[in-house]
From Swiss-Prot:
It is found in: Cytoplasm. Associates with the EF-Tu.GDP complex and induces the exchange of GDP to GTP. It remains bound to the aminoacyl-tRNA.EF-Tu.GTP complex up to the GTP hydrolysis stage on the ribosome. The gene is tsf. Belongs to the EF-Ts family. One of its GO terms (molecular function) is translation elongation factor activity. This is Elongation factor Ts. Its main location: cytoplasm.
Amino acid sequence: MAAITAALIKQVREDTGAGMLDVKKALTEAEGDVARAKEIIRAKGIAAAGKREGRKAQEGTIASKVVETANGETGYAVELNSETDFVAKTPKFVEFSEEVLGYAVDAEANSADELLEAKAGDSTVKLAVEEAAALFGEHVKVGQFAKISGEHVEVYAHKKSAEMPPSIVAMIATDKAGAAVAHEAALQISAMGAKWLTREDVPADVVESERRVATEKSLAEGKPEKIVPKIVEGRLNAFFKEVVLLEQPFVKDPSKTVGDLFKEVGGAATAFARVEVGKGEEE
């Protein structure tokens, strides 16, 4: 049996990310065999991972990348969640998020579900994530997934602080002319959180709901019935300016809209996506 030294424990900890006590127990069980100790940590960790799945995992990071395609470019953004920001900011967690992103690109995945079933070496991404949960000692999961394509795709990754990984990723697809203002548009998406590209993209039920609320509010305020329709249209336009990207006032110059930016360069935006850590569907 090999001696279980502090150096040996440190080596296995660095290789696996497991806690000191778990590493010491694994090395003792493996009689000092490093490879066997890693197997024990992995096996026990995966078994424990199932117990963590009920916990909230709303911290994390977003890995993003733009790749060239036959028709232009495609942008990917993948959210990887952990329970704490302590784990989220570790180099190993950030590195793993980049690996998961790579699997998404390799598989040309179109959704989080497709990504989980994609190959990860000799395994699947789903199993790789379960193994990661074991190593980090927290519930780890793939969260939001975004993919857009166009002649040009611009990505902006926002960090809330220097020591933290990206917590917001904004992507926008444009034609070639629109590429000139794509970065400014991506900054706008990150900061202002638009939900739709044009007002035509807003679902009819959402518009009708806003119309009803605006009507009821106007009547409750005692506005004369004959002018209520005009007031309602004004409030709907204000709603569109808030949620529609191309109608939002440009943050750096509110005298113009984001749509005006593209008109000035003779370009167009064709799609966009925004992913923010912890803002996906409730678990």
